[in-house]
Amino acid sequence: MKLLIMIEKIAALDIETENTGADVRNDNKRIISIQIYNKDISEIYYHDSKEKGLKLGKERVKSLLSSGYSFVGYNVLNFDIPLLKEFLDLEIPLSNVIDISQMNKVVELKQNFKMYKLEAICAEIGVRCDHKKLLVPMIEKLKQDPKIVERAKIEGSKIASLKSWSLQFSQDRALDLICGGSAILQAYNEFVESNGNTNSIFHQYAMGDVISEYELYNKLKRNN
C-alpha cells in the first residue's frame, strides 16, 4: 500500500510601494516591487526593470497559484492583496492566502504586549529581521529636513482630529511614516540606477522582509 504525502506549497509574498504620505493605506501611488521567497524561490520584480518588470511578476504569481501554491505574508490581507488588485489587477483568492498577523501567537502578542510591527514579532519569536535597520540612516537624515517636518505637523494635525489621538503623537507618527516611505523610495531609485544591484540597500531591505516573513511563518507553524 502506497502512502501519499501531500507537500505543502508555500511561498512568502511581499510588495513595496511608493508612499511618501502619512496614510499607510490610502497614500500609495504605485507598486514598485514584488518579492517572492521560499527555500527554492528567491525573486524580485520591479517597476523600472526591462527584464524583471511587474508584468512578469504578476504572471509569476499567477503561475504559482495555478500550480497549487498559497502565499504567506505579514498583514498581507489588509495591504499586499488589496493593493495588488488595485494597481496590477492581480486577484489572489483568499483561500490561497495565509496572513501571519492573524496566527494565534501573533494575535496574542498584539493583544497582550501591543506588538504590531514585523520586527517586534520577529524579535519575540526569534527570527532575524536586521534588514529593517538599513533604512535608519536615511530616515534620520530626512527627519532633519524642515519641509518634511512642517508637512508632518500639518498631516499630524489632520490625523489627531480624525482619530482623537494626541497632537504630538499624531505628528510624530506622521513624521515616521513620511520619512520611512521617502527612504524606501530613495533606496528604490538608487537600486534602479544600479541596474538592480543585489547588494543595494533596497534589494537587501525588500528581500529581507519576505525572507523574515517566510521564516516567521515556518517557526510559528512548528510551535503551534
Question: PLM features: residue spans?
Answer:
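Entry/capping segment at the start of metal-dependent catalytic domains
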Residues: 1-35
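Pocket-edge positions in alpha/beta enzyme catalytic cores
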Residues: 26, 46-49, 205
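Conserved DEDDh/DEDDy metal-dependent 3′-5′ exonuclease domain
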Residues: 38-165
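Acidic active-site catalytic centers that drive phospho-/nucleotidyl reactions
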Residues: 14-16, 99, 209
